[in-house]
């Protein structure tokens, strides 16, 4: 690895999870979580760090064309890392209140009722958007800082992520590696099951931090 200050500043690491791999069962198997975290997420971390190192080298050599190509890898692997960090935070076992809807006395709960009528309706809309993703991608429940703090459900393809003014509250991975070992090609069952372990408390904190 390069010892340059720029690389050291930009290096990322695989985060530790707040729960055991098997603690989301039966909704998401421990094996899926272990492979997803240790293998897939780690690949994005390694790819990003490698691309940063290559970029520093290309810039030091004045190789603009190479630097432009490398930046695409940085975007892909950096997006993969960013999305997965939020994905893990979006999940929690039932013992940590995973799946427990935000109360009507919370700011997020009030906003959901105001815009969607019920949390179940928001979930249905999110699942419909997840099902509409062709290939690999993500769905995010977001707060729009420039639209009166209104909520929305947006999707991205591959490892594209959301940026300002959108604040991601919940991220759901629609890549096959997130569900295929357990749900095979019936991804609708995965989309339905994951809400049993969604960390609404974390979503509420993120909502409140951008009031």
Curated annotation (Swiss-Prot):
- Give the record's cofactor note, including how many are bound: Binds 1 Mn(2+) ion per subunit.
Q: Name one GO molecular function term.
A: manganese ion binding
Top-tier EC class: oxidoreductase
Q: What SUPFAM superfamilies would the database entry show?
A: Fe,Mn superoxide dismutase (SOD), C-terminal domain (SSF54719), Fe,Mn superoxide dismutase (SOD), N-terminal domain (SSF46609)
Where do the coiled-coil regions begin and end? none
How this chain assembles, per its entry, is:
Homotetramer.
Q: Which organism is it from?
A: Debaryomyces hansenii (strain ATCC 36239 / CBS 767 / BCRC 21394 / JCM 1990 / NBRC 0083 / IGC 2968) (Yeast)
GO cellular component labels: mitochondrial matrix
The alphabetized UniProt keywords are: Antioxidant, Manganese, Metal-binding, Mitochondrion, Oxidoreductase, Transit peptide
This protein is called: Probable superoxide dismutase [Mn], mitochondrial
Checking Pfam families in the record gives: Sod_Fe_C, Sod_Fe_N
PROSITE patterns reported for this sequence: SOD_MN
Residues engaged in binding Mn(2+): 36, 84, 173, 177
């Amino acid at each position: 690895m390069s010892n340059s200050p720029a690389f050291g500043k930009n290096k990322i690491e695989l985060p530790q999870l707040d729960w055991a791999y098997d603690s989301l069962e039966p909704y998401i198997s421990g094996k899926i979580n272990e492979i997803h975290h240790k293998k897939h997420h780690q690949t994005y971390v390694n790819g990003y760090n490698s691309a940063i190192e290559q970029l520093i080298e290309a810039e030091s050599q004045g190789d603009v064309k190479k630097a432009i190509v490398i930046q695409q890898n940085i975007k892909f692997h950096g997006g993969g890392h960013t999305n997965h960090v939020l994905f893990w935070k979006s999940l929690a076992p039932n013992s940590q209140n995973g799946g427990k809807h935000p109360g009507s006395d919370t700011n997020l709960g009030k906003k959901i009722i105001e815009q969607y009528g019920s949390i179940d309706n928001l979930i249905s809309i999110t699942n419909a958007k997840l099902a509409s993703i062709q290939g690999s991608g993500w769905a995010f429940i977001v707060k729009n800082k420039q639209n009166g703090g209104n909520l929305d459900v947006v999707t991205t393809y591959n490892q594209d992520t959301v940026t300002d003014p959108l604040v991601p509250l919940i991220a759901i991975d629609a890549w096959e590696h997130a569900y295929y070992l357990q749900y095979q090609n019936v991804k609708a069952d995965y989309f339905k099951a994951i809400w049993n372990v969604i960390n609404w408390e974390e979503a509420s904190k993120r909502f409140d931090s951008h009031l």
